[in-house]
Amino acid sequence: MAMEPSPNGSQVQNPGSLPDGLIAVVKADCPACALARPVFVDLAERADLTVYTQDDPTFPTEADWVVDDTDLAISWGLDLDAVPTLLRIEGGVETARTTGWDRDRWEEFTGVSNLGPDLPPFKPG
């Protein structure tokens, strides 16, 4: 579950107008997403995170920064294979992504330490 460049190894323009920073694409009906819910809340407070949810616009319930993607337009445009997927967007371009919950990888990816200290260190997406 390595960090990867955008699909096909190239930088692709974002579908629509995605914000720069970190983007998490999640769904409530995903065990890894449900497990990582407190991490999304934490990242929203400590980093520039936007969450796109595929199935429940109220997931995570603590958030007012969730974007409804129940029509999957963003997810399809980003060519996602699994959730949770964490993406880095710079200058309107996806520069990296990682899939599934992996504490060490997410800390490296986000530059934020001590993510989900009470969670198992790994759960595939």
Regions found by a protein language model. Name each.
Residues 1-22, 45:
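A short beta-strand-turn-helix
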